[in-house]
Amino acid sequence: MKKIRRLLAVILICVFCVGVCPLASAAEPLPGSTDLYLLSENNSDGQAKLLGKTVTVEGIVTVASGVWHDQVNYFSIVTPRDSYRFGGGTLVYSPGNATQYKVGDRVVVTGTVVNGAYASDKGTTAIRTASSSDIQVRGSGVALPDAYPIYTDPLYEEVELDPGLRFEGMPVRVLGKVSDVAAEGTVRGFYVDGSRDGDYEDGAGRMQVKWYSYSGIESQVSQGDWVVVEGILMQSDASSPYTSGYYIRPSSSAGIQLITQDTVLRLSEAVRQKKDGTAALAGLSVTVHGVAAGPTGQWHESNTAFAMVSPRQTPGLDPVYPSGGLYVYGEGIAQPVARGDALTVTGVLGNAGYDGNVSLTPSTLTVTASEQPVLSEKFIYTDWSREQLQGLESTPVKIKGRVTAIKDTGITRTLTVDGSEDGNTTDGTGTMVVKVYSYSGLSLEGITVGEEVVVSGSLQKEAGAAPVGDYFVRPVEQVGIQRCSEHPARTLYVHLDGFRNDYVQREDWDTPVFDALISGGTRCTNAWGEYVSMTTANMTTLCTGAHTGTHQVPALAFYDKVNDRRVRFLQNYDVATVGEMFGSQGLLVGAIKQRKLQNRGADLFAECGEIAETASQAVQMILHEDPDLMVVLFNETDSTAHKYGTSGPQIQAVVEQIDDALGQILDAYRQRGHAEALNVVLVGDHGMTEVHTNLTSTLSDVLDAVGIPYENAAVNIGPFREDTKLVYNLASGSAEIYFRKPLTQAEYDALIAGLEGITGVARVYTRSELDAMDTPQNLGDLVVDCAEGYAFSTSVAEHGAKAQQQIFMVFNGPTIKQGELYETECRSVDCVANILAVHGVPAEDTVDGAVLNGIYK
């Protein structure tokens, strides 16, 4: 994602002393408003990159006036819940306290970015205002994002460098044991040991919880109590680098909760273990919410026994909290449970189940919904250590390996599988057992020693004295036991970002691999991507087989009318991915660089840099794990053309490097013995044309001339001025215009006439025309489409318009016609539909594509 900043030259050196704010700044303000997520970005010293700049930010107040300081306004603001995937927060320090702010107030703050607004919080990014007039209240009662669970010994890279969540200044939540309580004096609080090492007694890795006597915060905790604490994550490093010294500052007494009878915990908290693998909270009664990963009656004939896991989350739509699983085990089956049932369970934690996992003995069990999606499997290796596997207990996992032993008689039936990380699956070391029961309805029939299998199920461990025994996999569905010999087909699905149709078979360009795949397969000469022709929307389509109108990702960003703000996307689409559809059939999926499949169906994922590294990672994944579906992204053609154009030596070199990388990947399939069963799908997400005229200022001139108040969502992310009626978002080759307020017919007619009169505008699409193109409502009320050679951009080459919607698409495989040109119109959504058909994987209802019968023999 491009993060464009206009960082100005004036630097303010802030002087800190106890109880005193930094001096005022004369720094020139940054234009428009700044996203809190971007404000949270640090330099290598742990300080905000915008240090010393004057910014305007919008956020939600997390703590009322007077709680953190009794003489000035000192509080934190955070991004609202609807944008938590791009979460950020900052402290606000404003002279005086005549104006009072409440939790949930939506405020716009203008001030100088400083490193700590209070002596004890040095290292925490803050905004210092000149006066209370620099804080404007724009609403109240706004919901805050839920506190995010962290360990009390967080690493800097975990809490400040995550690409989607930066926790300094944000609400966090810790669980642990209390020590060193300070109940008197001005500074009060205690320490909590909830460190990742599982030793809650030694005080190593503990975190301070701190407040002041005037705050009104009360606490009844004592030494040795188990507590859950919610508050704002602060930093108190005295000097550079500001990468440690984290503590929690609560905003109210409700943020300090003793774990007593039936306390509600997250599953990831309830399953905390001691160093010996036993339940940390053993003997305590708690309440948890989750989803049944399997039915009752399958793991035990007469007792309640199943795994309960965290609800499956959609990254970008839901806050992505740490997941966990519990082994629910109790005498009798008072309440039958089916896979996918949403549950609320109250019971006692321990290690009392049939297996050695942390267990919950239920006193009450309530089914609140049915047919809910179950947490996706995490791919593991059979030789992973207990430390690597401990956090995955009772959650869905997937292994692939060679069968070294079988026991298919008696009540307990097993496979022993060697899927070790070293790739040697024949030496019998680093194996893991797969268990089913004779009464479970699951069968191992037909499996033989020496063959490869893919097994999905719950990660369990043998019962026994602490430290508890070996891990094994317990399947919950027959589809979770797959013989690789029954799935010989392999598919290489290559995503080519900004790949023009004419990049192959150009004179003097050396692309023998592309040429061979085209001549040995079918090239679709009338293939089209989604409109607008932007990467985020089209890559989402390539990963889901859904039109933008179905997956609701219109572009990189859009204007959200409901919340009056600009919203950006990463993975926020609530439809199944091709990886998830393959996974539902027990098949293995790998992805290289395609982040839209990361945690969304890719069992194996690798992030890469250069093209050579992409090829190397793909080759290693094919040779070692051999996924049924491999998705590889090459984004270099897009970035190179933006900078250098579509015809020079730079783009030629990149295309030839990708050609060479494809050759290496295909050779890996040959080494694996898949040459005869390999399917290859090559597809671009959009085209690319060179730009000779930038229309950005022309668009502004036209909007000025029409006289309708407007704002640019790229400059001001919202909230917007009260009189603003139009908000526009630039997408390079197009501009999306949103009606923030209704227009009169005269205004509408003048706007259309003005936009259509711009030289270089090919067309202005109205909402009814956009509906007919399968686009979502959040794309805009109007879209201004540039003619070829024109764009709202200064890049050498661009996309985003209808002129770049045609795409490169090739199918190659044992059932595909050879040397054919498929001239019937087809769409990028068809790629997933055809990949599913070749593998016999059922398509979800959200797949909009069609099987292209004309490309098959």
Outline where the language-model segments fall.
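OB-fold single-stranded nucleic acid-binding module
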Residues: 28-485
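Acidic/histidine-rich catalytic neighborhood
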Residues: 677, 687-736
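A long, amphipathic alpha-helix that forms part
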Residues: 612-622, 630, 638-678, 749-760, ...
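Sec-dependent signal peptide cleavage junction
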Residues: 18-29
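Metal-dependent active-site segment of extracytoplasmic phospho-/sulfohydrolases and closely related
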Residues: 493, 513, 657-699, 776, ...
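Active-site nucleophile/metal-coordination loop of metallo-enzymes that catalyze phosphate/sulfate
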Residues: 500-584, 600-602
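Bacterial N-terminal signal peptides
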Residues: 10-19
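Active-site neighborhoods of enzymes that stabilize oxyanions during catalysis
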Residues: 719-834
